[in-house]
UniProtKB/Swiss-Prot annotation:
Entry keywords, A to Z: ATP-binding, Cytoplasm, Kinase, Nucleotide-binding, Transferase
PANTHER family, per the entry: CYTIDYLATE KINASE, CYTIDYLATE KINASE/PANTOATE-BETA-ALANINE LIGASE
Subcellular location(s) of the protein: Cytoplasm
Residues the entry annotates as binding ATP: G10, P11, A12, S13, S14, G15, K16, S17, T18
Entry-linked Pfam families: Cytidylate_kin (PF02224)
Organism: Streptococcus pyogenes serotype M6 (strain ATCC BAA-946 / MGAS10394)
Keyword Kinase: yes
GO MF terms held by the record: ATP binding; CMP kinase activity; dCMP kinase activity
Keyword Transferase belongs to the record: yes
Recorded superkingdom: Bacteria
Name of the protein in question: Cytidylate kinase
E.C. code: 2.7.4.25
Classification of source organism: Bacteria, Bacillati, Bacillota, Bacilli, Lactobacillales
Amino acid sequence: MKAIKIAIDGPASSGKSTVAKIIAKNLGYTYLDTGAMYRSATYIALTHGYTDKEVALILEELEKNPISFKKAKDGSQLVFLGDEDVTLVIRQNDVTNNVSWVSALPEIREELVHQQRRIAQAGGIIMDGRDIGTVVLPDAELKIFLVASVEERAERRYKENLEKGIESDFETLKEEIAARDYKDSHRKVSPLKAAEDALIFDTTGVSIDGVVQFIQEKAEKIVDMS
């Protein structure tokens, strides 16, 4: 049976990662959290106080402490920078609020996209992000673009933060998500947009199971036809 490449794109908190992880597990595919890679680069910049004028230093740190993914005992995915487990720290609000400017740096994107394509070569992979279908995997057999209202996405982020013990204000989250939407869709390098051949799916009011079922059925149909 052919193993395909699945690209899931969409704005912040549209449910990409949650859905991608479930589908990867169901299909026995590899899940690559590209957002965690950009968050890791952002964490480096913030930890060292680097600005957008010091891209070479961020890349140097990435080379010294490469990003890797490992499985935890419960099956969840852990993110490492060198030997440091950064799974939780890269989800903190300061990283979330700065990831847009770091991910907009051409040199950072070029390096991480190169890493992502190398991992995806064999197929049997599902990636989620902002530009997977348009830039990273333009040859993906299935491209999905998830959207949802700002209100719904803020609600999801608020619940996620509660579960992780991160304090947050609902109204502030709404403002931050709207601001990030604008930044992501207006940046010069790889702006957030749906690929021409992507299936656009509005997840507002749709359960996670409903979104998973929609994407998985499309994937299985493509595999059956190949």
